[in-house]
C-alpha cells in the first residue's frame, strides 16, 4: 500500500474536470494485481487577477525594459484569497533553474530588483489612475 497526492491546476475549470475524470479512470484498471482508489481531497475555484492591475504591471515592465510574460498561477498564495474581496494581482520573480518553494530556490538580486521595480511603477500607475 502507498498513498500519494496529485495536484491539478488550470485556468479553465472544464479542463480540470477532464483531468479529474482521467485520474478517476485509474480505478477501473489493474496493474500487476494492484488497484487504485481515487479520492478528491479538496477543491478551490480558479482565481483571475484584476485586468487593470495586470495591465499596470505589464506596462511598467515594458517601460522599464524588463523581460516579462503573463502566467496563470494556481498556487494558494494569500493573494488568491484577497482577490475575492479586492482587485489583486501578483508579480513572480524568476528563480534559478525554475525551483520554487524549496530550499535550493534562488532569485538573483538583479531579478528581485526588476520585480520590485515593476511592482513600484505599477503601484504608481494605479495611484495616478
Task: Specify the residue positions occupied by each region the protein language model found.
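Midchain, well-structured core segments that form catalytic/ion-binding scaffolds
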Residues: 1-18, 42
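Generic anion/oxyanion-binding catalytic loop in active/binding sites
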Residues: 5, 71, 101
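Short gly/pro-enriched beta-turn/loop segments at secondary-structure junctions
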Residues: 1-2, 31-34
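Active-site-adjacent substrate-binding region
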Residues: 35, 39-94
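Hydrophobic alpha-helix feature that most strongly marks membrane-spanning transmembrane helices
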Residues: 7, 28, 62, 84, ...
